[in-house]
Amino acid sequence: MAIKRAAFNPAVRAETDLHDCALRLARVQDGHQRFGLFVRLSALQAGLRREHHLRLAAAVFDPILRRFEAQLFGLSNGDLMLITKDVPVLELDNLTAKLRGMFADDPMVYSTGQDGIGFATMFDIRRSPSDFLGLCETILADALARHQTIPSPAKKTSGRTDDSSRLTAQSLASICEGL
């Protein structure tokens, strides 16, 4: 799937940055182990998608971000994508377990969506960069569709202003009387 960027859309900045990163990683063959951990917070029940829940979920990644070479993308729909370099799989499994524990009240945490992606899905970028790039393209396309603005039809004006919207001495007097 090819994504064309017509114009910069700040509403999908994280998705655009993620897609750019995935494009670069698809070309890199340096022998480093790279993983992508996609956390689908947008599929949780509405009560668990509040702003403070999203902040707490992002904070779970802080130890990884401090100790390893990693980058966290907070997407516009609330989902998170962590891209890591040379992080042990056990560390990522521990993160996933913490996140599942935080949102254990939601049945989606332990199920898989129709697209085969569950609550937390790990991608081995080094072994299958095309799968990861495909996911990132889908994420970007969905975000662009979600934030697409439909221009309203232009108003036809004859150059005259509507008399009812003018402030006149009479309308001002009637306003003052009403007070």
Question: What positions do the PLM features span?
Answer:
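Regulatory and interdomain segments flanking nucleotide-handling catalytic cores
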Residues: M1-L179
